[in-house]
Each structure stands twice: as structure tokens, then as C-alpha cells.
A protein has these predicted regions:
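Short amphipathic alpha-helical heptad-repeat segments
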Residues: 274-282
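Short, charged helix-capping/linker segments at alpha-helix termini
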Residues: 263-265
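Charged, alpha-helix-forming regions
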Residues: 1-260, 283-313
């Protein structure tokens, strides 16, 4: 392994790449992600020259099986991307990697030659760009999950929007997919991405038709939540129920929880159940623990006793 090769936590790429039409598969895009990770935005690249990026073959093989590597590199070399400018109604076609070399001179590396124009394109982030976690990206085994992840991270970063809308035709175009109706697109693209996001990215992706022409879906509205958002909402819902509930019923429920899940002394139980402030704190912290917002390293009883101020002089 090349000791000088290091993966950075996040990738940065222009939004025009995120929203470009690409014909690459999941393995090609993993290699692309590894290459983008090696871009140095503080370096003064010569804009008149091509540049060679070197990826250790052993590093690439962690994410792309050796038997698929040549075909993936061939596709990266041969397939174009189309970059759209909707405002000006124009588009450009680019070949990012016109040349590559595999293990030249037994180097143990893949050498990707990036043209000067392609390098300028990749480095031109502007004020708005896409930032995503490389490790999460490399876990996806679906190209559609990869593409949706980039779009979601672009929207979250640039617009801080957890709700946004895209035309179905546009998504079908940039994803280069043949799923030409909403039902198939939802099943093959969106549902897969939603499952992958939940398992690998701590994101909850929801979607629904936004606009229709007759029965045909024209655009899709996306709603994004993190798993942490959902946990906070669960705590808030439980606290709202607590505030509305009959006080006597609350005491009975809290006492039952203490007996089943905690080992307070009788004096501590009495203090909690007979103090509205302590009882409210107990219910909220218990909810945060149960919903995963608080990770307990010792014991729930010890943590809550400390939070309630027991043992202080």
C-alpha cells in the first residue's frame, strides 16, 4: 500500500457534476469518487495541462472487485457526461478521462489522465457545491442510491432544505434510466435509495407526487429527515402526551417505569414522584434514553440520579 495515499472524509464537487447526465454504473462511480477525493482545491494546477491522478490498485479493490476493474475503467474512459444549464437552455458534453494506465511499470497504481478542461470543470466549485461523506457513498451498491445521495446532500448543504422538488423527466434523464413512469421509477430507484439511506446514511427519504397532468406524474416532492430528527420528534411527542395526561396517571406510569428499569432508593422514588420538576426531568431524560438520543455507558439509574441532582451536597 502506498503510504502517501490518504482518503479524506468528505468529497467536494461542482453541482453541475451532481446534476449531469451520466452513463456510468456503480463501480465506475466509486472509482470516480476515489479520484475526486484526491483533488486538492488549495493546489495551483496548471490550467493548460492535463493531470495524472494515481490510485493504488489495492485501495480501489476494497470497493471494486478486481474482475470488474478493467471494464469499469473502460467505461469511465469511454462514456461522456452531459452538463446542463437550464437557465441558458444549453448543455455541454465532456469526456473526463480520455486515458488511463493500469499497473504501468508494475507501479501497483491506476493512473487516470484528466484533461485540463475537465480538471477546471471539477475544481470550479463556485459558491454552491456538493459535499458528501465518501465512506457512506462507497457503501452504496446502487448507482441510483449514489446519485440520489449526492442530490440530497447538495440540497441540504446549499439551500438547507429538507424539502425540495424535481421534475420526473429531469431525474430520468440525468440518471440515464429506462424507468419511464413514476410507478417503475419509484420501485426501482426511489424505494431502493430510501432503504439504502436508512441503513447506511442516517437519513430518512420520503417522496410523493407533487404535480400531475391527468394521471401522469410530472414532478416529485422529496422530504428529508435524519434519524436524529425522528428521535427528537418522538421525544417531543411523548413530552406533549405527558403534559396533557392526568397527573395521577402520570405518577402511576412513572412509578411502573422506575420499578422495571431503575434501581432508585425508596427515598429517591418518593422525591421524584412528589416533585413536578423532578418528575418532568425524569420523564424527558428517560424518553431521550429510550429513543437513542442519550447513550448510557454505565447504568441508567446512575445517569438519571446524577441528572436529577441526587448525591450533590
Amino acid at each position: 500500500m502506498d503510504s502517501t495515499f490518504e482518503l479524506k472524509k468528505n468529497n467536494y464537487q461542482p453541482n453541475s457534476l451532481t446534476l449531469s447526465r451520466q452513463e456510468w454504473g456503480v463501480n465506475e462511480r466509486k472509482i470516480l469518487g476515489l479520484l475526486i477525493n484526491q483533488l486538492d482545491f488549495n493546489r495551483d494546477y496548471d490550467p493548460e495541462k492535463s493531470h495524472i491522478f494515481k490510485l493504488p490498485i489495492q485501495e480501489v479493490a476494497k470497493y471494486v472487485d478486481y474482475k470488474y476493474m478493467k471494464a469499469s475503467l473502460d467505461n469511465l474512459q469511454s462514456c461522456k457526461i452531459q452538463v446542463f444549464n437550464k437557465e441558458k437552455d444549453t448543455f455541454s458534453s465532456l469526456v473526463l478521462f480520455p486515458e488511463y494506465h493500469y499497473n504501468r511499470d508494475n507501479s501497483g497504481k491506476i493512473e487516470m489522465i484528466v484533461t485540463n478542461s475537465s480538471l477546471v470543470f471539477l475544481l470550479n466549485l463556485g459558491k454552491e457545491y456538493t459535499k458528501y461523506n465518501l465512506d457512506i457513498f462507497l457503501q452504496f451498491q446502487s448507482v441510483f442510491s449514489q446519485r440520489m445521495y449526492e442530490i440530497v446532500m447538495m440540497e441540504l448543504k446549499n439551500n438547507h432544505r429538507k424539502s425540495f422538488e424535481y421534475e420526473l423527466d429531469f431525474l430520468q434523464q440525468i440518471f440515464d434510466t429506462k424507468y419511464n413512469n413514476f410507478a417503475n421509477f419509484k420501485l426501482r430507484v426511489l424505494d431502493k435509495a430510501r432503504n439504502d439511506f436508512f441503513e447506511k446514511a442516517d437519513l430518512i427519504l420520503n417522496y410523493e407526487p407533487a404535480k400531475k397532468k391527468g394521471k401522469k406524474v410530472i414532478s416529485i416532492k422529496f422530504m428529508i429527515q435524519t434519524a436524529t430528527d425522528v428521535k427528537f420528534e418522538a421525544v417531543e411527542e411523548e413530552m406533549n402526551d405527558f403534559r396533557k395526561a392526568d397527573p395521577n396517571q402520570v405518577v402511576l406510569v412513572a412509578k411502573d417505569i422506575m420499578l422495571r428499569e431503575y434501581k432508585f432508593s425508596r427515598e429517591q422514588e418518593f422525591m421524584i414522584l412528589n416533585s413536578p420538576d423532578l418528575l418532568t426531568t425524569f420523564v424527558e431524560i428517560n424518553s431521550r434514553i429510550d429513543n437513542g438520543l442519550i447513550k448510557i455507558r454505565s447504568s441508567k439509574t446512575h445517569y438519571l440520579a446524577k441528572s436529577l441532582g441526587f448525591g450533590k451536597k
